[in-house]
UniProtKB/Swiss-Prot annotation:
Keywords: Cytoplasm, Exonuclease, Hydrolase, Nuclease. GO terms for biological process: DNA catabolic process. It catalyses: Exonucleolytic cleavage in either 5'- to 3'- or 3'- to 5'-direction to yield nucleoside 5'-phosphates. It is an enzyme of class 3 (hydrolase). This is Exodeoxyribonuclease 7 large subunit. GO terms for cellular component: cytoplasm; exodeoxyribonuclease VII complex. Bidirectionally degrades single-stranded DNA into large acid-insoluble oligonucleotides, which are then degraded further into small acid-soluble oligonucleotides. The keyword Hydrolase applies. It comes from the Bacteria.
Length: 399
């Protein structure tokens, strides 16, 4: 039996025609849980529809996506109306969705919501417990896979932003059973060593199953108990994990985590320049204040110094001595004037001066001055004092 050899395109086109013409596959209603959700920039939506034992890739083109009245979410249980076909360029089987309606929440999403509610009630998400990131870290610890895109993105962004910050990697599994224990070990390692200023925990995007290790309660508590601030940088912007809520800062992607953690070199230089200027001004102001205080102290010291007091005492002694000399001169002059006045008065009443004018003083033999004839008896001895000498005689009354 001869079998015709077909090209790849012939095979894929044949299968596509078979599927497109199949009554059941061309008008399907399928129930499942959304996983690996991606909103494309073109407006198309790509995701995987899964249940406990199977999965199908799905696409909803923009023309139908704009009619959705709710946003699709990881773990959401939905019913899809559409058709099954293959994409000839890749030969991949997929569902082309015309309509999507909510059916309920998947098991993982329900588990996620329950843990989120539990931890929220216990205070693990409270802003009061969020640690502030240091503005100018020197070393940043990274807990992620050493071979994934996340570490490459973090290193590239960090290097571009600043050469002053060191990046230290703790290699950890970020996917698969028990990977969260590796991540916890990395957090504990950096806390034990105290060798970094910030920790970034992260990985690239993925389905809810692939990111599930970042929804484990043990990891959430390890992040909460870390003494070092932690940035959660898990998945893409639309991906949210428990780690995002409990971490001190949430970054939409690993690259954004590096941008948050690492300051630009220019900003650091500008900050250092500002600090230098402020320090110069502070030192200059302090020196001016010290100079003014020193000048004031010198003035006070000059006024209250012992030498100043001695100098003032010398001046006071000189002043008092001048006053004393003046008082003595004034007193002496006054006394001289008194003596001179008394002398003049004495001279004016001097008997010699009276005698010199032609008068005489008569004394009896008992040296009494005779001022009246009644004091004399006949033949009584007398002494007459004249200007140029004394004369003795006897008193003879006139007849």
């Amino acid at each position: 039996m001869n079998i015709k050899t077909l090209t790849v395109s012939e095979v894929t086109n044949y299968i596509k025609r078979m599927l497109d013409n199949d009554f059941i596959l061309s008008n399907l209603s399928v129930k499942g849980e959304i996983s690996n959700l991606k909103y494309h920039s073109s407006g198309h939506i790509y995701f995987t529809l899964k249940d406990s034992s199977g999965r199908i890739n799905c696409v909803m083109f923009k023309s139908n996506a704009v009619l959705l009245d709710f946003p699709l979410e990881e773990g959401m249980e939905v019913i899809i109306k559409g058709r099954a076909s293959i994409y000839p360029a890749t030969g991949s089987f997929q569902l082309y969705c015309d309509e999507i309606r909510k059916e309920g929440l998947g098991d993982l999403f329900i588990k996620f919501e329950k843990l989120k509610e539990k931890l929220s009630k216990e205070g693990y998400f409270d802003e009061a417990y969020k640690k502030e990131l240091p503005k100018y870290p020197q070393r940043i610890g990274i807990v992620t896979s050493p071979t994934g895109a996340a570490i490459r993105d973090i290193i590239n962004v960090s290097t571009r932003r600043s050469s002053l910050v060191d990046v230290v990697l703790y290699p950890a599994k970020v996917q698969g059973s028990g990977a969260y224990k590796d991540i916890i070990s990395g957090i504990n390692y950096f806390n034990r060593k105290k060798s970094v200023d910030i920790i970034i925990v992260g990985r690239g995007g993925g389905s809810i199953e692939e990111l599930w290790n970042f929804n484990e309660e043990e990891l959430a508590k390890a992040i909460f108990n870390s003494k070092i601030p932690i940035i959660s940088a898990v998945g893409h912007e639309i991906d949210f994990t428990i780690c995002d809520f409990v971490a001190d800062v949430r970054a939409a992607t690993p690259s954004q985590g590096a941008e948050i953690a690492v300051p630009l070199s220019d900003n650091i230089k500008d900050r250092l320049l500002d600090i230098s200027k402020n320090l110069d001004k502070y030192i200059s102001d302090r020196l001016d204040t010290c100079r003014n205080n020193l000048s004031g102290a010198q003035r006070i010291l000059k006024v209250h110094s012992p030498m100043a007091k001695i100098s003032n005492s010398y001046l006071e002694v000189d002043r008092l001595q001048d006053r004393l000399n003046f008082a003595m001169r004034t007193k002496i002059k006054g006394e001289k004037n008194k003596v001179e006045n008394l002398n003049n008065l004495l001279f004016a009443h001097n008997p010699i001066k009276v005698i010199s004018k032609g008068y005489a003083i008569i004394k009896d033999n008992e040296n009494n001055i005779i001022t009246s004839k009644e004091q004399l008896n006949e033949d009584k001895n007398i002494e007459v004092i004249l200007k140029d000498g004394n004369i003795e005689g006897k008193f003879i009354p006139s007849k």
